[in-house]
Amino acid sequence: ASMLVGCGGNNEKVTAKVIDIDLTNEEYAFGVDKEQPELLDEVNDFIASIKEDGTLDEICNKYFSDGEPEAVKSAKLDTTKDQLVVATNAAFEPFEYTKGEDYYGIDMEIAKLLADELGKELVIENMDFDAVCLSVSQQKCDIAMAGLTINEEREEYVTFTDSYYSASQRLIVPSNVTTFDD
């Protein structure tokens, strides 16, 4: 998976190369309400299952290759129903984003499959990123699914599941650059 960012003002055609050194390594996981250890176990079992059977790779390939992303619908929150309430910030494509009323992204497709597996109706609560883990810790949502990097600060609010995605950052430079001084 890659994302390119660049700047420049001339029309000179320049080729680029990737420096094959990971600058950062991050593990993404979901954050579960600390008061729901059984949900944590169910989510970890689910992650293991979709890794093993290839479902996770299929979902990722939709967003990093030429696949067709699937729209995910959210039900309305209703405390009388058996629902899985997901906290997200749908502004981190390809993990979560919106088009109209529909949600898309790796995390959102996983959320739909997880809700189906648990026999629950899916509710997606879209909020500011800083509120995602907090809303789970306050039992307003069951699980945080927002392209979350595992870190100590967030662990104060949620219990992280097993990792489902590894990310790294690399430099992309003009192909004629041969040293870091360039």
What positions do the PLM features span?
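C-terminal motif of bacterial Sec signal peptides marking the signal peptidase cleavage site
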Residues: 2-6
